[in-house]
Amino acid sequence: MPMYQVKSYHGGSAPLRVELPTCMYRLPNVHSKTTSPATDAGHVQETSEPSLQALESRQDDILKRLYELKAAVDGLSKMIHTPDADLDVTNILQADEPVPLTTNALDLNLVLGKDYGALKDIVINANPASPPISLLVLHRLLCERYRVLSTVHTHSSVKNVPENLLKCFGEQARKQSRHEYQLGFTLIWKNVPKTQMKFSVQTMCPIEGEGNIARFLFSLFGQKHSAVNLTLIDSWVDIAMFQLKEGSSKERAAVFRSMNSALGKSPWLVGNELTVADVVLWSVLQQTGDGSGVAPANVQRWLKSCENLVPFSTALQLLK
């Protein structure tokens, strides 16, 4: 006999029926237009709305394009970082041969703009204590290409200018009227910390530094180079102005080794044609005096090749 007797809660002799759940959590059907909860496991509709299908299609297209872009980037990365890459720099160098300096003159209007009859005048301020030899070489090269009106002036900030610098452009006798010249080249000896150049006094700020001015002047020759050669030329100009001219003895020795290696492969520093890199490096070597008896064999041969050209030999006379 039980200690406690409890009445049945399911009602008499009726069988006990318990409805067991078919899922742990019952949620409303998100695809249904009604808010009533789903009553069975097959609440997901087999067909979705057109807008949802369009969204899924766009997502697939975007993912496909991203995968293609990633594959292209991976291929470029492998090409750059792998030593045996498919990109052959030698073919690029051979495909883009530089235009020699003996070709026809460049249309200055394309580089300097139209002045509607006015003479295009390049004005350079330079300190006679440190004459920019490379600019004098480039001036002579420009005279071989264009009809250049050359003038030399002395600023009041300078007391004494050597006679050879006053006559660095030769005799100043004008043989033609001003409008018959293609280019004006005015050199002003002035007490300035760095060599300065202005082409359009009203519209441009001055270009400072012998290397930067040499780059600008050499662009007037219209020489074409590949991207690789242009990078090498700019690198040599920077090396000349910062390491060779202002660096320590160890830095200058490293420059000589690099020059000797490059000149062992070609007659000039970059390829088979004279570039602004040769002009600037030769000028710095003359200013520092490092080219006399210290340079390696290939550099000595290159120095003689430079001095065999009239623009270089004429500028060299100014240092004596």
Curated annotation (Swiss-Prot):
Main location group: cytoplasm
Biological process terms in GO annotation: apoptotic process; negative regulation of cell population proliferation; positive regulation of protein ubiquitination; protein ubiquitination; protein-containing complex assembly; translation; type II pneumocyte differentiation
InterPro entries, per the entry: AIMP2, AIMP2_LysRS-bd, AIMP2_thioredoxin, Glutathione-S-Trfase_C_sf, GST_C
Keyword Nucleus in annotation: yes
Keywords associated with the record: Apoptosis, Cytoplasm, Developmental protein, Differentiation, Nucleus, Phosphoprotein, Protein biosynthesis, Ubl conjugation
Annotated compartments: Cytoplasm, Cytosol; Nucleus
Listed GO MF terms: molecular adaptor activity
Region (Interaction with PRKN): 82-162
SUPFAM superfamilies to which the protein is assigned, alphabetical: GST C-terminal domain-like (SSF47616)
Family annotation (Pfam families): AIMP2_LysRS_bd, GST_C_3, Thioredoxin_16
Stretches for region Disordered: 31-52
Gene Ontology terms: cellular component: aminoacyl-tRNA synthetase multienzyme complex; cytosol; nucleus
Residue ranges, annotated region (Interaction with TP53): 162-225
Residues found modified as Phosphoserine: 36
Function: Required for assembly and stability of the aminoacyl-tRNA synthase complex. Mediates ubiquitination and degradation of FUBP1, a transcriptional activator of MYC, leading to MYC down-regulation which is required for aveolar type II cell differentiation. Blocks MDM2-mediated ubiquitination and degradation of p53/TP53. Functions as a proapoptotic factor.
Subunit structure: Part of the multisynthetase complex (MSC), a multisubunit complex that groups tRNA ligases for Arg (RARS1), Asp (DARS1), Gln (QARS1), Ile (IARS1), Leu (LARS1), Lys (KARS1), Met (MARS1) the bifunctional ligase for Glu and Pro (EPRS1) and the auxiliary subunits AIMP1/p43, AIMP2/p38 and EEF1E1/p18. Interacts (via N-terminus) with KARS1. Interacts with EPRS1. Forms a linear complex that contains MARS1, EEF1E1, EPRS1 and AIMP2 that is at the core of the multisubunit complex. Binds FUBP1 (via C-terminus).
PANTHER family per the UniProt record, alphabetical: AMINOACYL TRNA SYNTHASE COMPLEX-INTERACTING MULTIFUNCTIONAL PROTEIN, AMINOACYL TRNA SYNTHASE COMPLEX-INTERACTING MULTIFUNCTIONAL PROTEIN 2
Protein name: Aminoacyl tRNA synthase complex-interacting multifunctional protein 2
Organism from which the protein derives: Cricetulus griseus
